[in-house]
Amino acid sequence: MNFYMKYLLSTALIALLLVSCHKEQNAFEQSPSERMKQQRTALQNELTEAPYGWKVLYFPRTDSLLFATPTKAEKRSDSRYVEKLLNQGFGGFYFLMTFHKDNTVSIQADTYSQTIQTAKTSEYNLSQEAQLQLSFTTYNYVHQLVNNRFRAAADWLYVGKDTLQNIVFKTASYADPAREYIVFEKLKTSEDKQQFLQKAYNNRLFFEQMQNPQIVIKRGSKIYYQSDVYLKGNSFGLNTPFLEGFVANRYYVFEYRTNPQEDPSTGRYRSQFIGSGYVGTEKGLTFRAGLRYSHSLIFYDFVRQGNRFVAEHRDSKGIATGYIAEIFDN
């Protein structure tokens, strides 16, 4: 390499370093308050520049450990079992939210037909101290969950984005993971906006109106778990408040008798349980913290196929493992 070429190369490298240092210097020249203001403005722009609004999935109070060991059989007559069922976990809710630049938000909810059709307009605020926070400052459908049952919150802390570029929030209620779930997904078409909440409601209602919902977990022809107890019947001593809790709390438990020869009328047989909170989606059902067969085999999202809900298990890399879970009315 001759002297002239070396000179040009050195000059280019020096210029590149100077530009890089200048950019870095500009970043550090911003004060913390300026950076926070920039982040707040960016989030507000993103929320308000979604012409069709946002699908918001909110599980305010999940419990990943309530039925976390289904392969461990429990006595149905055990007081701990009864306490777990009567104090079962809680499911989620689906909202349609449309944010406006005047700090108002229109919200529809999946609770009833009326809440799907009737939007409530309330005020919201984006503030930032230690963390960027979205607060619903006047009453809307979210506040209906701020009670002793669901223990929801109307102040949501911005976490960031997931791998699908959905916006993720949390609340200050829990430090532990898997205790709540708040995800915003941008709606892409006016048709989605008009239909997704009604479809989600219909799928949830279809599941809740099943007379004898059961689940089977299988891989090929091999069955790993198949529930077989008729929980909605009266022959096993389940009282009305317990059954009402399934729907009111949006939580369901599937039960499998480990010894079919035991008399079910005694209530003293041993069973294995799988349970989780749920919500209807436009495609089917979503369970959080998931229907768990083992620590690595957990089913979350079920697609409605005719009269069944089917979930295909995938590993941490998104590769199908061959395990399938199906919920059906037996």
Per-segment meaning from a language model:
Residues 4-11:
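Sec-dependent signal peptide recognition
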Residues 187-330:
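Preference for solvent-exposed, low-hydrophobicity sequence contexts
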Residues 103-233:
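Long, acidic/polar, low-complexity amphipathic helices and coiled-coil-like
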Residues 22-123, 127-131, 190-215:
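Acidic/polar, low-complexity intrinsically disordered N-terminal segments immediately downstream
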Residues 57-59, 98-100, 108-110, 127, ...:
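A structural detector for beta-sheet-dominated domains
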Residues 17-20:
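C-terminal motif of bacterial Sec signal peptides marking the signal peptidase cleavage site
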Residues 43-46, 96-98, 156-160, 297-303:
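Short linear motifs in intrinsically disordered
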